[in-house]
Amino acid sequence: MAFRIEKDTMGEVQVLADKYWAAQTERSRNNFKIGPAASMPHEIIEAFGYLKKAAAFANHDLGVLPLEKRDLIALACDEILANKLDDQFPLVIWQTGSGTQSNMNVNEVVANRAHVLNGGKLGEKSIIHPNDDVNKSQSSNDTFPTAMHIAAYKKVVEHTIPCVERLQKTFAAKSEAFKNVVKIGRTHLMDATPLTLGQEFSAYAAQLDFGLKALKNTLPHLSQLALGGTAVGTGLNTPKGYDLKVVDYIAKFTALPFVTADNKFEALAAHDAIVETHGALRQLAMSLFKIANDIRLLASGPRSGIGEILIPENEPGSSIMPGKVNPTQCEXMTMVCAQVFGNDTTIAFVGSQGHFQLNVFNPVMIANFLQSAQLLGDACVSFDEHCAVGIEPNYPRIKQQLENSLMLVTALNTHIGYENAAKIAKTAHKNGTTLREEAINLGLVSAEDFDKWVRPEDMVGSLK
């Protein structure tokens, strides 16, 4: 195995000869052997690709970086964005809490790759310096938070939202398809008055719609970038106008509406935007957990449960019980939601730990955020494709449950009063008879009036 010698301010370090990273990356590799290698999310590396390219363009426009260096840095960044350098980012999230070592990993790779693109060889002195050129007008303290926002925004907008919208549309379509299917309702897990299966599914569609609105409402805060604040938010060592220009380039390169942060001291010292947006992801997870639970309970059986809906049978459910099929998509969804709840606890805690001018829990915060955003999107697509689109009413079971429910007696309240209606229900329950039989036996309602007043289809309100 061949090595070359790289240097930093602490001295010489051996680096694998064919790798573009240099001394600081290698030190981090050796000092933080914690968990799987290269666990820094790819989305963060991609975000740095946009960021470093934008910085090179802004620095050139403002007269502090020559055109040749700008173009070489941009070429190397384009290779990062094209996933051509994925094996050059070996660092873990368990490193310095500011993300300094990953920032330097990108700086070193861009500098060395730019040198090679210019005809040089690894190990030679590069015309592009990782600090003086690639990191010009920047600090890890403003670049890593900026990369966090870019990565989080892109993941939510390009993945999470479209995937949740897909499932929401399916529930809305099912609500319309099932609008005339009258069934018994349940509160406290006990029988209640009727509603339609369409009305029940309309609640699921509405929950996801509100969750999507909440998520989208957090995006303006998330779109604010810290870049230009440098070390503590003052913008030290940046040319005038740099913060506005560099973010304009990021917006151009990503085709997303990023803006410079209103207050860069807040943008470095706190990550409330990440906490806020993940809170909306938690809200969606809460809704999805409730929906998945409802669906697996409504589908329970096939003969000894509620069994009012039929869900797709995707795979055998047991290694010992022949013919058993389980609500596996519901179970996967609830596990994903549980993971999001755990991630939210981590994010909320580390979000509270910004001391003075900097929060130093950045890598773990963004890793948890990106996992939540990815998992929720993936789970919604999986649930939609393998469960939701195939849900159908179990008409015989719905009819049986509806006719057996004692809570249809509620329709008699306005005619004979609550206490008399309760007497009918309790007597029917005790004797194992029907409401109609006991209403007539007790002399409280005639057969004709019972048939006129107790009509489940008239108890569900508007079907529109």
UniProtKB/Swiss-Prot annotation:
PROSITE patterns: FUMARATE_LYASES (PS00163). Pfam families: FumaraseC_C, Lyase_1. Its EC number is 4.2.1.2. InterPro entries: Fum_hydII, Fumarase/histidase_N, Fumarase_C_C, Fumarate_lyase_CS, Fumarate_lyase_fam, Fumarate_lyase_N, L-Aspartase-like. Substrate binds at residues 98-100, 129-132, 139-141, 187, 319, 324-326. The active site is at H188, S318. Keywords: Cytoplasm, Lyase, Tricarboxylic acid cycle. It comes from the Bacteria. It is an enzyme of class 4 (lyase). It is found in: Cytoplasm. One of its GO terms (molecular function) is fumarate hydratase activity. The record marks E331 as: Important for catalytic activity. Pathway: Carbohydrate metabolism; tricarboxylic acid cycle; (S)-malate from fumarate: step 1/1. It catalyses: (S)-malate = fumarate + H2O. GO terms for cellular component: cytoplasm. GO terms for biological process: fumarate metabolic process; malate metabolic process; tricarboxylic acid cycle. HAMAP family: FumaraseC. Belongs to the class-II fumarase/aspartase family. Fumarase subfamily. Involved in the TCA cycle. Catalyzes the stereospecific interconversion of fumarate to L-malate. There are 2 substrate-binding sites: the catalytic A site, and the non-catalytic B site that may play a role in the transfer of substrate or product between the active site and the solvent. Alternatively, the B site may bind allosteric effectors. Homotetramer. This is Fumarate hydratase class II. It comes from Haemophilus influenzae (strain ATCC 51907 / DSM 11121 / KW20 / Rd). The gene is fumC.
